[in-house]
Amino acid sequence: VMRWRTIQTDQTGLSLVELLVSMVLLSVTLVMISGLYVSATRALGSASALGTNTREASNGMNAMARSIRAATANPVASPALADPAISEARNESLTLYAYVNLGLSTQQPVKIRLAVDAQRRLVETRWASIPHPGGLFTFATTVLSTRILAQTVAPSGSGLPLFSFADSAGVVLPVGSALTPVQLRSIVTVTVTLTVQSSTADARSAVTLSNTVGMPNVRLAVGGP
């Protein structure tokens, strides 16, 4: 009888309540682990996007600053005044003449356009020069090269304009409409504010760089300090 009672009262395994508690605890643990995994994945993704955008903004800024700094007026046969170094000045586009190293045996000017296209890419377009007697140059109508400096520039109106232009007195020129040749000749600095982000709709990892680039050749020509 005693042996039967011992067997009767010797319960092994988990009770229903213990099983339910274990399942709840396991579920909570799995939720916590999933949350940590998602958070870590998002953090790594944001860090990667931030690094990519930083490199792209830096490279794009360096390329633009190099071209703008080399801007030079383009002498023409007539009229006596040379064409302005910057022939187009807008908030999201500019066209200039510059002497930059193109790997040529003789240094010749190049026509460069920096502009944001319909896909919000920052694109550099170049045209080669055609030499003429008297040290004069015109420019080919066929594009020499095109390259993308930044894949996704922040939407227009979301911050400062990509380009703003100032004269030797530091006065910013309005570019709501096309500038006159006199105004274009007065430009001696270009402030570039470049914001690069992962997509036009995602600004969480956006990177903004700003740089005021002087044009020493133009400043010397207009007699600025």
What are the roles of these predicted feature ranges?
Residues 2-73, 224-225:
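Aliphatic-rich helix starts adjacent to a transmembrane/signal segment
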Residues 3-4, 52, 146, 152-225:
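Short linear sequence signals and composition-biased patches located at protein termini or domain-edge surfaces
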Residues 11, 88-89, 187:
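A generic fold-level signal
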Residues 71-73, 81-96:
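Short N-terminal edge-element motif at the start of the domain
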Residues 80, 106-110, 207:
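Residues that act as N-cap/strand-start positions at coil-to-secondary-structure junctions
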Residues 88-174:
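Type IV pilin-like appendage domain
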